[in-house]
Structures are given as structure tokens and as C-alpha cells.
Amino acid sequence: MTDVEAIVQRYYGDRPVLQRIEDALRAAGVDPEKPSHRDLWPFDQLHSRGIAATREHAERARIQPGMHVLEIGCGLGGASRYLAAECGCRVAAIDLTPKFVEVARIARKAAAMKRMIRTRRV
């Protein structure tokens, strides 16, 4: 593990991310086993300006159905799910943080997007 990876793991790795998301979904009246990609927006857009920024980037990149997109630093996979669902593209998503990749995979499966998104830890 490099120094950068160790710093990222220390900062992000020990938080009970999945449990917090499941609790928040239940509180919002959403079944955590079957959320839509939109149900996850309040929790999975970890970058500044959230879903608005994701939309703007997708529009500026002119992402079209059938395209293949690489998301580097996917976090919980929110932008990947947005791009796959709203733009109709396939996404390869990568991140350094094992727990984020785990949550991204669980959310991808729960939102029935497993065939459209491949998520890996690098």
C-alpha cells in the first residue's frame, strides 16, 4: 500500500457507510434492499454540488446511450449509477477505498444496474 492509499484508507475506510445509508433510506420510507438510483442521490454524491454537478458534467461530456465511460475515484458509485441510468451508457468505476467499492457494488446490485456498471478497487 502506498502512502497515498494509506491516507485515503485512514480518512474514509473506518466509517460505517452502508449502515448509515440503510438507516437513512428506511427513515425516508425506502426499502434499502430495492432503492432506485434516485433514492440514493442524497447519500452517494460525495463531490461538491452533488447531483447538479453530476448532471452538468454528463451534459458537457455529451455522454450518449451505448458509450463506455471510465469513472476514476467513484466513491460510492453515485455518478456511475446516474450515468448508466440517465444517459444509458456502460460504466467502469474504480476507487482506492475498499469499503466504498463494497458499498458501490451493493448499491449497484440493489438498484438493478449490475450489467451496466463494473466496479473495482485499484
Give the positions of each predicted feature.
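Conserved adenylate-forming
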Residues: E33-K34
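N-terminal auxiliary segments of SAM/dcSAM-dependent transferases
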Residues: M1-A28
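Class I SAM-dependent methyltransferase SAM/SAH-binding core
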Residues: H68-V122
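Class I SAM-dependent methyltransferase Rossmann-like catalytic core
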Residues: R38-S48
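Generic structural marker for isolated residues within well-ordered, non-membrane alpha-helices
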Residues: I21, T54, S80
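Short, charged N-terminal helix-start/capping segments
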Residues: M1-Y11, P65-L76
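Conserved alpha-helix/loop element of class I SAM-dependent methyltransferases that forms part
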Residues: V30, H47-M67
